[in-house]
Amino acid sequence: MKILHHGAVNGVTGSCHELQLDDKQGILIDCGLFQGAEVSGDKSSANDLEINFPIAHIKALVVTHVHIDHVGRIPYLLAAGFEGPIICSEPSALLLPLVLEDAVKIGFTRNKQLLNQFQSVLNKRIVSVPYGKWHPVFEGLSVKLKPAGHILGSAYVECQVGRARQRKKMIFSGDLGAPYSPLLATPKAPYSCDTLVIESTYGDKNHEGRSSRRKRLQQIIEKAVADKGVVLIPAFSIGRTQELLYELESIIHQSSDKPLDDSLKWGDLEVIIDSPLANDFTKSYRQLKQFWDKEARKVLSQGRHPLSFENLLTIDDHETHLQTVRYLQRTARPTIVIAASGMCAGGRIVNYLKALIEDKRTDILFVGYQAQGTAGHDIQTYGERHGYVELDGKRYSINAGIHTISGYSAHAGQRDLLNFVKRMRHKPREIRVVHGDEEAKREFKLRLEQLLGDSTEVVIP
C-alpha cells in the first residue's frame, strides 16, 4: 500500500492524490486543475491537462470539495477511460455539475447536446454520501467524509483499509477551513489515523480574527466611498463570494441608517455580483440551508436574507456586464463589485481591472490566495510600488489601492492546521505535507516536528 501524489506537490493547485492498495486497486482523492505557473509532480503544467498516470486500477474518485483546483481535471479523467463512481458529500453532489459544466464550456465545447451528454454521464457517476457515515468502496476499503469547513460541502476523507487488527486509517485533509467562518461550522479534528496527508496553504502564517477582518472590510469600503471610487473584489464563484455576501449583509444591516458620506448611506450602497456561475452557486447555497451553521440559521430566523438582500444586484448576461463596466469607468460611482476569477486569471474581473486599475479612486481587495504566475499575484506583489500588470497582452499601471484580507481565504491558518493535528487523540505515525508554497511547507513541517517530536515522521513529498 502506498500514497502517490499527482498534483498539489509544487504549489497549491492541481490537487490529486492516489491511495494505492496494490497494482490492481486504488482510489483518487480529487482531480484538480493546475493554475498559474504551478506544475504537477512530473512537471506537467497548467496547459497540459492530460491524465498522465495509470488509471486502469483506479476504482473510485473521492471529491473533497468542488473548487476547480480540486475537480477541474475530472472531464479529462472521464475521457481517459475512468469508469468508477465519483464519491462526494450531499452538498457537493448538487454543486459539482455546475462547476464542471462551466469547466467543459471553457475547455471543451459549448455545444448544448455535448454538454447534456456530459452531464448525463456525470450524474450517473456521482454518489452522494452523508457526513460521518462509512461508505464501502470495494472489499477492504471504506471511506468516511467529515465536514472540513472550507466551503459548503467540503470534507476531509478518512480511508479505512484492511480488516480487524491489520486495519489502517489514512486521512486526506483536502482544504481545511478557518474557524468561525461565515455559514460554516468549524471542522473537528479526527480521533486517530496512521497517515495524514495535510494541506499547508497558510502553513507559515496566521489569519486575523473574524471581527478584525470584518472591521477592515468595512474600513476599506468606507475609504473607497470617500475616494468616490469602486471596490473590486476578485473572488472564487463558490465559497468566498457567499462568505463575502454574508458579511456585507451583516455590515449593511447593522449600519443601514448610518451615512457613508454626505450623499450615501450604507443602506443605499450597491453590491454587484457579476458572475453567472457565482449567481448559480448562490442560489444553490440558499437551497442547502440545512447545511449552514447555527449562526447563519439564526439570521434566517430573524427574517433576514444574507445571500439575497435588498442592496444586491446580480448580472448574468454579457451585454449587461459590458454596460456596467463602461458605466463604472465613466462615473466611478461608489459600488462593490464581486467577480470571478479569484486569481484574476480570466473571467469578468479582468474587464473591470482593465477599466479601473489605473484610476486612483479604485480599491482592489484580495480575499484569497494568489498563485504565482497569475495576474492577481502580480497586482498584489507590485501594487504597493505602483508597478504594472499585464492583462490580455497589454500593460496597465497599478494606480488603484491594493488591500488583502487573508481571513476570507477559506483556508485554515498555521495555528488552525496545527490544532487539527494537536487535537487528535492518537497522533499519526506519518504526516505528508502538501498543497503549499515551498516556504509554507517547510515552516509547517518544522512546527509539526516541534509539536510531535520523534513519534511522527513528517515528510514533504
Can you say where each PLM-predicted feature lies in the sequence?
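A short helix->loop->beta-strand "cap" motif at the edges of active sites that frequently abuts
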Residues: 25, 81-85, 227-229, 267-269, ...
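Hard-cation-handling environments
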Residues: 220-375, 390, 434
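A short, acidic, amphipathic alpha-helical segment used as a generic capping/interface helix at domain edges
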Residues: 347-356, 409-425
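C-terminal structured "cap/appendage" subdomains that terminate the fold
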Residues: 417-448
